[in-house]
Amino acid sequence: MLTPKRVKHRKQHRGKMAGNAKGGTTVAFGEYGLQAMEPSWVTNRQIEAARIAMTRYIKRGGKVWIKIFPDKPVTQKPLEVRMGSGKGSPEKWVAVVKPGKIMFELAGVPEEVAREAMRLAMHKLPIKCKFVKREEVGGDAHEG
């Protein structure tokens, strides 16, 4: 499971999920990517389940990059505890995902295999996603 090794503060505010992703919106490492279409918290267990689903399908072929990391602690109070008496203890770690963020990347497999692997990963995640391909930036810009 993905968790931070050490953190400056054990507990965090929930924060807002307004707006689109600032960075990480293009396919950088692989050939294909899985892009978020809506904002959500994605837990470390969901990330791991999606990774396993993809790697099982591609069967040792290709490489998978995980572009999100669960660095936000989410606290929870125990069951049947009265209100008040402080904030609960950290229960799980989540990654804040905003629309446009590339969450996973894949390379070294044919497009139809990548598409199916990403489709299996989408079912493990709590948000709508879309399959994207790497956009080659014009290579003839410096010639002339």
UniProtKB/Swiss-Prot annotation:
Any one GO BP annotation for this protein: translation
Record-level Gene Ontology MF annotations: rRNA binding; structural constituent of ribosome; tRNA binding
Keyword line: Ribonucleoprotein, Ribosomal protein, RNA-binding, rRNA-binding, tRNA-binding
Pfam family, one: Ribosomal_L16
Cysteine pairs bridged by disulfides in the record: none
GO cellular component: a single term: cytosolic large ribosomal subunit
Residue span of region Disordered: 1-22
Record's compositionally biased regions (Basic residues): 1-16
Subunit text: Part of the 50S ribosomal subunit.
Cited function: Binds 23S rRNA and is also seen to make contacts with the A and possibly P site tRNAs.
Protein family: Belongs to the universal ribosomal protein uL16 family.
Name of the protein this chain belongs to: Large ribosomal subunit protein uL16
Organism in which the protein naturally occurs: Brevibacillus brevis (strain 47 / JCM 6285 / NBRC 100599)
